[in-house]
């Protein structure tokens, strides 16, 4: 299903963010959030989805039934709600969303899109038994609809950087306070790699709430090897193979996942061998994803390798640029599409020392996309040679004309919705 029939997405800026609305809605629906399996609650700016995917892969491989709630989605809404390891069916999705619609109208509640879909997900999770629920925040943490869950089993805070400043604050400590809102008294929290001022904010919050924290660089860490990485903590040291998800940042995500499992492993008893295999089997599309040339042979020759990455903020751009610098040698073409709340020049500045040709495109599946002309003009301010194309498909065609049959790489980035546009071309 592309989108549920209810609630209807809105792009209003006056949405009230608090937990009162979701609490009223869940009461009207019978408080399904009180009957969920043990919850792993995840907040952060980057790495939430990758960490969720790794956890899902590991727990599934270990034989556990896994519920998972993530956002946004690539192609269809069902991706967001995984019930006992399977994407929710169209029929079940319609049923739980209809329950939300009926309750909303009966009790005069106007849920936001995320509040309504979160309530629908909880209804689906309540109906089917599972051993664990991986629950990802939508925005922030403290006032996020998922934070209605008062007693998770454990929490994870992935790397925090600048994003959604209009909602979360314009400094890293302010953003960190919002993300730290998922911390609960006496519930362990794994803290992934952060800059110092974020660490200090999270440590202070953990101390205030009496949260047992387990922190990257302080309580556990990694050392990269030729075949993977060595994870070490006060509890154990073990060499794990390279994860299926590419990039050094994914080693840090993997380390945080391993740390999390180690803290709850008395309850689940997952071996390091299963963790290793789970990391190797993780699938999470559009994260430095190498697309098989046969899938896009109608678009361009197989001498050109297409990569997809959903980097959309400065920290994501930095990670992607570092990976390109370390791994790609042939000519590089960057196809960029971004939403209107993104700073194009800042994003592109991370790629300015690379020999790169940029193409700005409008994101067709994003109503609030920057125009191709704006991306072209703003991208040029960073020092990159930018052009504009009428569409993603035309950008690939333009590259084909310039590049011919020579070896090259195309990086499609800037928006998850642009990645979605690409998959629809295949």
Range-by-range predicted roles:
Residues 1-13:
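Charged, amphipathic alpha-helical linker segments immediately N-terminal to NTP-binding catalytic cores
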Residues 13-15, 19, 26-37, 61-150, ...:
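ATP-dependent carboxylate-amine ligase catalytic core
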Residues 36-38, 127, 132-137, 143-156, ...:
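Nucleotide phosphate-binding/pyrophosphate-handling subdomain across enzymes
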Residues 38, 42, 50-67:
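A conserved segment at the C-terminal end of the G1
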Residues 69-72, 192-193, 205-224, 244-248, ...:
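Beta-strand->loop->alpha-helix junctions that form or flank phosphate-binding loops
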Residues 72, 117-167, 199-239:
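Extended acidic/charged loop-beta regions that coordinate divalent cations
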Residues 195-205, 210, 225, 302-308, ...:
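C-terminal helical cap/extension that packs against the catalytic core
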């Amino acid at each position: 299903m592309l989108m549920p029939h209810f609630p209807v997405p809105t792009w209003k800026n006056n949405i009230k963010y608090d937990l009162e609305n979701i609490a009223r809605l869940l009461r009207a629906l019978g408080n399904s959030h009180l009957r969920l399996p043990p919850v792993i609650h995840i907040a952060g700016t980057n790495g939430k989805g990758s960490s969720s995917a790794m956890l899902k892969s590991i727990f599934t491989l270990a034989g556990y039934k896994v519920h998972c709630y993530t956002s946004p989605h690539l192609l269809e809404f069902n991706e967001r709600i995984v019930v006992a390891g399977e994407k929710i069916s169209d029929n079940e999705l319609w049923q739980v969303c209809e329950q939300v619609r009926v309750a909303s109208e009966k009790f005069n509640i106007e849920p936001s899109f995320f509040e309504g879909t979160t309530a629908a997900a909880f209804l689906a999770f309540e109906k089917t038994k599972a051993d664990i629920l991986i629950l990802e925040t939508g925005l922030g943490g403290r006032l996020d609809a998922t934070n209605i869950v008062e007693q998770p089993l454990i929490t994870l805070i992935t790397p925090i950087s600048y994003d959604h400043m209009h909602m979360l604050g314009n400094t890293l400590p302010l953003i960190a306070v919002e993300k730290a809102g998922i911390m609960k008294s006496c519930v362990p929290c794994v803290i992934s790699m952060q800059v110092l001022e974020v660490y200090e904010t999270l440590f202070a919050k953990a101390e205030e709430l009496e949260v047992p924290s387990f922190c990257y660089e302080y309580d556990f860490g990694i050392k990269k090897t030729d075949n993977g990485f060595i994870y070490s903590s006060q509890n154990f040291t073990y060499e794990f193979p390279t994860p299926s998800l590419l990039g050094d940042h994914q080693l840090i995500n993997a380390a945080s996942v391993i740390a999390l499992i180690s803290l709850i492993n008395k309850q689940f008893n997952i071996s390091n061998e299963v963790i290793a295999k789970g990391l190797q089997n993780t699938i999470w599309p559009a994260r430095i994803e190498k697309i098989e040339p046969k899938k896009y042979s109608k678009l361009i020759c197989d001498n050109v390798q297409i990569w997809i990455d959903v980097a959309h903020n400065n920290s994501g751009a930095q990670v992607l640029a570092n990976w390109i610098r370390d791994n790609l040698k042939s000519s590089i073409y960057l196809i960029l599409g971004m939403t209107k709340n993104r700073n194009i020049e800042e994003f592109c500045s991370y790629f300015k020392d690379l020999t790169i040709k940029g193409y700005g495109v409008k994101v067709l599946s994003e109503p609030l996309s920057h125009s191709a002309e704006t991306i072209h003009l703003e991208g040029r301010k960073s020092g990159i040679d930018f052009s504009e194309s009428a569409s993603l498909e035309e950008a690939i065609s333009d590259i084909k004309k310039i590049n011919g049959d020579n070896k090259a790489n195309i990086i499609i980035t800037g928006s998850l919705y642009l990645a979605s546009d690409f998959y629809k071309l295949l």
